[in-house]
């Protein structure tokens, strides 16, 4: 009888642990954004001004980036006579 009770206790404990680890928490992205805005306001920042500055900087900093032709095939190559010793 004691072994059945112990087995039942272990099974229930195991199921509780699995349930706690498998819980899915849904987080609304608007909530996170609202919390960060509230924090910035409490720290004394003007949130609308920060957003305006961010938009202006993103428009001003549009940079045309390009690759100069890919990797240099000779970068890691070496002549067979000068093979490094390991």
UniProtKB/Swiss-Prot annotation:
Glycans are attached at residues 46, 71. One of its GO terms (cellular component) is apoplast. This is CLAVATA3/ESR (CLE)-related protein 7. InterPro entries: CLAVATA3-CLE (IPR039617). Belongs to the CLV3/ESR signal peptide family. Residues 1-22 form the signal peptide. PANTHER family: CLAVATA3/ESR (CLE)-RELATED PROTEIN 7, CLAVATA3_ESR (CLE)-RELATED PROTEIN 5-RELATED. It comes from Arabidopsis thaliana. Coiled coil: none annotated. The keyword Transmembrane helix does not apply. One of its GO terms (biological process) is cell-cell signaling involved in cell fate commitment.
């Amino acid at each position: 009888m004691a072994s059945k009770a112990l087995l039942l206790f272990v099974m229930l404990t195991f199921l509780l642990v699995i349930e706690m680890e498998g819980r899915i928490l849904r987080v609304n992205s608007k909530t996170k954004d609202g919390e960060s805005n509230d924090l910035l306001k409490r720290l004394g920042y003007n949130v609308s001004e920060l957003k305006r500055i961010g938009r202006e900087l993103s428009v001003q900093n549009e940079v045309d980036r390009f690759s100069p032709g890919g990797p240099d095939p000779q970068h890691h190559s070496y002549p067979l006579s000068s093979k490094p010793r390991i």
